[in-house]
Amino acid sequence: MALKIVVLAKQVPDTRNVGKDAMTAEGTVNRAALPAIFNPEDLNALEQALRLKEQNPGSTVGILTMGPPRAGEIIRQGLYRGADTGWLLTDRLFAGADTLATSYALATAIKKIGDVDIVIGGRQAIDGDTAQVGPQVAQKLGLNQVTYAEEVLSVKDGKAVIKRVIDGGVETVEAPLPVVITVNGSAAPCRPQNAKLVMKYKRATCPMERPAEGTPYDNLYDERPYLTLNQWSVADVDGDVNQCGLAGSPTKVKAIKNIVFQAKESKTLTASDADIEGMIKELLDEKIIG
């Protein structure tokens, strides 16, 4: 059966490069100051979506993300791997959202997209590690949900068969469509970008990224509509501004500290019995061991 699949994806700060400017004064992530990447577990989810597309002729895969205009980059990265379209939720009213406000915005967008069979995303994002957004989206849409998925084995007769991780092993479950699925980072890694698709979509942009008239390639967007990515505001998805962004986020970060572990002093030991015995005695005296 042909499936309409939406992949929930997030552009996240690269946590390997967190510096002193990582947070704003309001306690939110300063995304402009940090390198941005495609959330790793969302790539695992994208791979599952693309496999389903291959197994079910006529299926489509779309990338849904929320963020500033530069977040359109992860839609392009999805297109380079085989996705068909994408939607970027971008509006200052979306800014500063916690998981509750984020799931509300994504759910309203999914309603606007309409007739979705499978919503699939990573288990959690590396900038929050809450694993809340997927289940909250399912709850707001009133859909079945399967979390901690390793693989979507098949979709047949209106049901998805999914292998998921549980304590002490794995289980295989069957869920009626439509369904929301969250995927673990231990699932199959996402395929690499396809050179032909990179050439096809490298100039795909949302309207806020569009080059000014008269600049090179600006005429491409009339000639090739597929290069224009969908860009939606709060109003476009009929969202309630009181449930979006900071206004709709009951979670408040009171303070954040950057903790750096540093050794105050170091000692060089040899492999001699005397050095080893001396170190053990010192650790015992300092109550570090024993």
List the model feature ranges, each with a label.
Residues 1-290:
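N-terminal glycine-rich FAD/FM-binding segment characteristic of electron-transfer flavoproteins
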